[in-house]
Amino acid sequence: MTVKGETNFWKTLKTSLEGGEYIVSRLESYVTPGFPDCLIYNKVTGFFTIELKVINSSNKVTVSPFQIAWNMRHSLAGAKSYILVGGLPNHHVKLFHGCKTKELGQSTVDQVPGLYEGRLVDLDLSKIVSNSETP
């Protein structure tokens, strides 16, 4: 994953979500290692977090031990925590529940069950977040 790739992915996500339904903030936290990249608010779902990742040439993402710890702790406690992976073929994305962070660090993206795979423009986050439970 390159910083430029993730930055471009962030810009695409923000553009896709802006339009009144979502308030999207990108966070860079050096105080709390592992804190996800995005804090998002929707009046239906409330707050939730998304960690952005871009696949590498091996069809994997790089996940730090801090990111694994943060997402596992919070998602297993019931927090709305997700990983959104970009860079898939056909400009698709894949959304994972935060409790899948450790698996994502150990496997290829296609080996880990996700909540959604398809075009970013078709991703209905409010529906998925409202209906998802910790697997």
Predicted regions and their residues:
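Conserved catalytic cores of phosphodiester-cleaving nucleases, focusing on short active-site segments
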Residues: 38-40, 46-57
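Beta-rich catalytic cores
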Residues: 34
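Anion (oxyanion) recognition and catalysis
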Residues: 18, 72-76
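Active-site-adjacent loop/helix micro-motif of nuclease/hydrolase catalytic cores
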Residues: 56-68
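Charged phosphate-binding loop/patch that engages nucleotide di/tri-phosphates or the phosphate backbone
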Residues: 111-135
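Sequence/structural signature of beta-propeller domains
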Residues: 61, 96-107
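Acidic-basic catalytic patches of nuclease active cores, encompassing PD-(D/E)XK
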Residues: 1-29, 43, 93
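Nucleic-acid nuclease catalytic cores
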Residues: 75-101
